[in-house]
Each structure stands twice: as C-alpha cells, then as structure tokens.
Amino acid sequence: MDSLTDQVFYMNRYPTVGMVITSEGVVAIDGPMKPSDAIEWRDFIASKGPLRYHINTEHHQDHIASNWYLGGGTIISSEVTYSDFLTSLPSVEVAKERMLFYDPECGPLLDGYEIRWPDITFRRRMTLRLGGQTFHLIFSPGHTRGQTVVHAVEARVVFTADNITPGNYPFFHSAAVWEWFESLALLESLDVDWYVPGHGGPCRKDEIPRQRQRMFDVIGEVKKLKDLGLGREEVQERVNYIDRPGLEHPRVLGDRAYLLQKNGVGIVYDALGEHPSGQAG
C-alpha cells in the first residue's frame, strides 16, 4: 500500500484503488479485480477502521468484482453504472471464469462468490459527510457513460477512475466520447493536490492535457480514415494503437485488450457522426 497523506491510501494494482480514513470509518473507492488482491485490500482497510462506504466509479469488472470480497459498507454508484452492471458481469459464472484467468491460483477464493450490487444510486451529484470529511460524488461520463469521480475535499484529492490513466492508452469501448472531454475540464477545475487515476500512479493536474491529447490522437486517426470513406469495420481493423511504443495497455487482459480496442474504435467512429452538443430537439 502507498499513501498520499496520513488519511489517503491507494493500491496500484488492477485497477488502481483508493481509500480515505475518517474519524468514523473508511470510504473506499473501487477495489482490485483479482480476488487475492481484493482480500489484501479488504484486510488493509480493516486495519484502518470499519468500511462505511464503498464507491463504484464504473461498471467494468475490474472495478466492481471485489464488491463481494470487501463485504460491509454501503455501496454507492451512479444510476447509469447500476443499470449497466450486467453488461460487464452478465453472470456469476462469467465473473468466476474471468477471475480465474486473471488470477489462476484464486480457485478456493471463489467459493460462494456472488455479484454484489450497489445499495444506493444517484443521478448527477451526491455529497457524503463522514467523520469530518466531505466527499462529492460527481456524475462524469467519459471512459464509461456512467462514470463517477470522487472529490475528497478536505483531503485535497480526487479519484478519477479511468477518465485519467497516466502512461496508458485510453480505451473507448464503453465511452461517452464527447462528454469525456467535458469531464476532463471539470477535473481541471477542482482545487486538489492529487489525482488518483483508474490505472497507473497518482498524478498532478498537468496530466490532464496529456490525457486529452492521447484521446485526440486516437479520435484523429479514426476521423482521418472515416473521411477517406472507410467503413466502420474496416477502420476497426486498421486502427491498432495499443501496441505502439511510448505508452502501455493492461497486459493482464491478454487478447481481450484487442477486442476492447476494436470495440472502442467503433464507438469513436460512431461518435464522429454525432454533434458534440447532442441531438437536436
């Protein structure tokens, strides 16, 4: 485990997860996908205090599979994340199969495993006050259409989930493409010292322009091919950015990373036919 302050801790696994200690218990943001990591994270949380709230920032399996392992604590997500839960974990069987792939020695840890859903949902914004700490949960579509960022005000840190991924290529397979840029602008406006991303280590505000540029690079490549008259499937086959030098992608995903990239290129292709302000009406 690593710390940013005496009250803020994070674990840079898959994904990067975080927690804030208050005088009345712990607020955790996401949890590790591997069962062995999730149990390690659970035990660390317990060493700091009771888990009071557990926030799911998105519906992707790497962020929600640990809900069952962490136990206790009220789980909170956006309404959209709640509605998309089964698109990532369609069944307990699929969840177990993927966890065994990512964590081959975890078999005994899967006994009794269940998909644990959020207990409370919110639409645009929610504020938690616990033990002298204030947490603003802000609906911030981007990497997924239901994304949440968590602004821990007094701790001067924001947990961005996959809206920021330092050193990693962006994935668009569940993205709200144009809203993602709006969410980055919101993150830039916050008065914080640290940004804890969904993948990679904590960063400063100067990471946000780099994230924005990485997204522009992918979108620009797709646009160039689309403008040449190439169809959606052809563009999906031709755009392969995650193997290029300079940045990383999650190797733990194996070949699935290429499927996610392909699906994301399709999402970008479709978004280029939309007006960023949305549909008229």
What are these regions (language model features)?
Residues 1-5, 105-110, 129-134:
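Short Pro/Gly-enriched beta-strand edge/turn motifs at strand-loop
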Residues 21, 67-72, 130, 151:
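Short loop/helix-cap segments at secondary-structure boundaries that form the rim of catalytic
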